[in-house]
Amino acid sequence: MVKKFRRLSSGILAMVMIFSLCFTNAVQDASIDISSENETVGLRTQLTFLEGMPGDNHLVYTYQENGQQYKVVEDADVDFMNVYSTSYVMNSEGNYEEIKSQVLNVQPDGNCLLTSTDTHGNSNVSKIDITKSVKSVDKSTEVVGASIARAYTDPGTGEWVTQTWDGSSYIYNMTVTAIGAVLGAAIGGKVGAAIGAIASEYFKKGSDYAYYHVVDSWMMSALYPMTVIIREATHTTYYLDSGHKYSTGTDYYEYDGRW
């Protein structure tokens, strides 16, 4: 009787071990599948805004990364052409210590300069092309360099031209307001609450690039010796990946210069 009980117990134990092993492998396989398909694993958590909201010229927020607490203070000028950011880390005594400062300067030629300075005064200046890559989606869109060429239209007929294109911007190691400034400069829209919220998502994910799909409509008028845009409407969808599977939000910009 004892031998039968032992054999029965051993059989049950073996079944449990086999089931546990199969279950563990199934979980591991599922994890591998998810990580290979979805590269949107968040790096920063508990993002909390203490002063201002994303899209404001002044912003103070805290977040956690790799078990440490950080604080960032940011100030931008009216047009978000210059963004000043200072980052702090909380020490063992619960006080914040400055670890670096950054200055983002968006230049008229479409590029930007990112200057990072550590606590020892060592600075590193990087020149960043905010429109890293641009490609047309429809055949009517002409790509010149890393920009979209707009064709002349006759405002007297109320003619609109619509073009769609995809692009990406390099945002590695940038803060929330700096990312918003880059996106605003790349698309040509105003930095506000919508772009600010999208920038926050990129920041939380620690994204290297911001990807977007743009539907751009405009009307141009001749103003000697050049042509100018008198009306424009731009709808942009932002993504975490180049395949445009994981959206971070949308933004709409409209301009009417007829008045």
Each language-model region and where it sits:
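Bacterial N-terminal signal peptides that target proteins for export
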Residues: V2-I12
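Sec-dependent signal peptide cleavage junction
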Residues: S10, F19-R44
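Short Lys/Arg-enriched alpha/beta "domain-start" segment
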Residues: I32-S85
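Core beta-strand residues in small-molecule sensory/regulatory alpha/beta domains
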Residues: Y88-N91, A233-H244
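Non-catalytic propeptide/linker segments at domain boundaries
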Residues: N95-Y152
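Short hydrophobic membrane-inserting alpha-helices and related fusion/pore-forming segments
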Residues: T177-G196
